[in-house]
Amino acid sequence: MFAFLEKEGISNLNDIDHNVVRLFLTDLYHQQLSRRSVSRKISSLRSFFRFLERENQVNKNPFMQITLPKSDKPIPEFIYMEELEKLFKVNDLSDPIGQRNQAILEILYATGMRVSECQGLLLENIDFSLNILNVQGKGRKERYIPFGHFAEEALRVYINDGRTKLLKKAHSLTNTVFLNARGNPLTARGIRLILNKMVEKAALTIHVNPHKLRHTFATHMLNEGADIRSVQELLGHENLSSTQIYTHVTKDRLKSVYMKSHPRATTDDH
């Protein structure tokens, strides 16, 4: 700010008015700063001038009426189905650890649940008669999330076989669904490490974590026609704006919609 004022020949802070601030904003954008960086600078200057005003060093705060630019919201990264299919094939389903890892992967992708929700999942939270999970979300808010055939099969195999074997190694019983090699409840960090090992086994070059699987769940649901309000409820978002970041569509989906919908996209004999 002070370098800008010197360039403009302004030495008295009381000479900074709305027009000067606008020029300063233009200068920031010419520097190709992100909206978030600009917002941060304006917010800091607003606080600084508020202090000066309180100390009677300036007559007014020229930044009070400036609306902060909305932050850039990056499009969430998601995993393509071909990459997911490779992950689904890496686990040894005859081994308790492999059964557990498969169940974690299937349930994270099937439900879009947060890693904390997966970590805290209890046996009594699973209703196999309806294939629905009762999840404790943020602020201990409950929500129900359905899951499909592949997740059901992976959970049943793990709970009936792998989990029973892991639990025998524990010093005390627990109703937590996902256990580590010693039979104790898995941590969120443990779940992330499990996914990292799966990626290594699958020889993928992408980064996979629970939140990326959550992004993938939302993206795939919306791309396949799920309405945004339903996805909002499944994800446990309070505000629709949190879900709207997933309304980007893949290039494949865009091309598919175009080819099906545009009258001159294809010839009749294709």
Task: Describe the residue ranges of each PLM region.
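Conserved catalytic core of the tyrosine transesterase superfamily
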Residues: 1-270
